[in-house]
Amino acid sequence: MITATSSLSQNVQAGLPHIATTHDTTPFISVYPWTGAFGTKVADPATLPTGDGSGINFTPSGDHIAVGHRIAPSISVYPWSGTFGAKVADPATLPAGDGRDMAFTPSGDHIAVAHFDTPFISVYPWTGTFGTKVANPATLPTGIGRDIGFTPSGGHIAVAHVTTPFISVYPWTGTFGTKVANPATLPAGDSNGVAFTPSGDSIAIGHATSPRISIYPWTGTFGTKVANPATLPAGTGRDIAFTPSGDHIAVAHTTTPFISVYPWTGTFGTKVANPATLPGSTSGLGVAFTPSGDSIAIAHEVTPFISVYPWTGTFGTKISNPATLPTGDGKDVTFKGFTKL
């Protein structure tokens, strides 16, 4: 029975910001209230994802949370009200192979999943349940889809993938348009992450092989690649996030210091000094800022699996770990209200 007190508690909980992370050991997803510090871990969903968690995102309205994972159905979505609701029924046509990452359109009316097997991307209408899978693009991405994002206007969808050209972008009107011409200078290796600036005027790709991050002006087509930062990320670029104001870009990567942040004004500024306490002791795999831009979170291998720092244009002192840690290597991280572009 829901009492007046418990109902009020649920409403307060639902209104709080939350931080969510995926990991490679059951329950594969961990969510915590966020108030500038970690709250008590939210109870696991009744039906867990079926394998290692990879990507994670909330709907733009924050009323559902989606998890990409290994093993069919490859994507699991739950109503969200500060706690997990009953898992939404799987789509009639599942993504082909392990789900890697997913994104919702800015309007929240479609969900896109990057996945392991051809066609490497699957998009579904979203109304709180999955609609019929949208027809594949005429020109498929050339390899495993690893990350996905929409422009802020929702007019284009981008897929980071293995195999040249490593990035594929399509006009989006509820169906796929003709693939946009490749950039003149391709990313230098398999792509792992993609993000648009909040203003939508640049697209950033994290990838294997130096320089490990490539950024291009974006006007519906790729512009000339922006000059590399003076100090490159030290290892394979995995995930990318811009601050909500668009004035900094963060790259999670392999090799110490595992996170690199740069001022962004359409070109790279001087790399921000590393945090005093680095995230974990091996690969940074996911990165996100709070919607207000006052904290930055990194999902990483090795305990504590997630590290969060105050952010004021520089790293503050690492925030205390949650009382209940994620149970395995952190794969991705997001905040409720953080827009994955």
Explain the meaning of each model-derived region.
Residues 306-308, 325-341:
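Blade-level signature of beta-propeller repeat domains, shared across WD40, Kelch, NHL, RCC1
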Residues 24, 70, 116, 162, ...:
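Short loop/turn segments immediately following the C-termini of beta-strands
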Residues 46-50, 92-96, 138-142, 183-187, ...:
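Surface loop/turn motifs at the tips and blade-to-blade linkers of beta-strand repeat domains
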Residues 1-18, 334-341:
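Enriched but not universal
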Residues 36-44, 82-90, 128-136, 174-182, ...:
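Beta-strand initiation motifs
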Residues 16-17, 61-63, 107-109, 153-155, ...:
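Short coil/turn segments that connect the beta-strands within blades of beta-propeller domains
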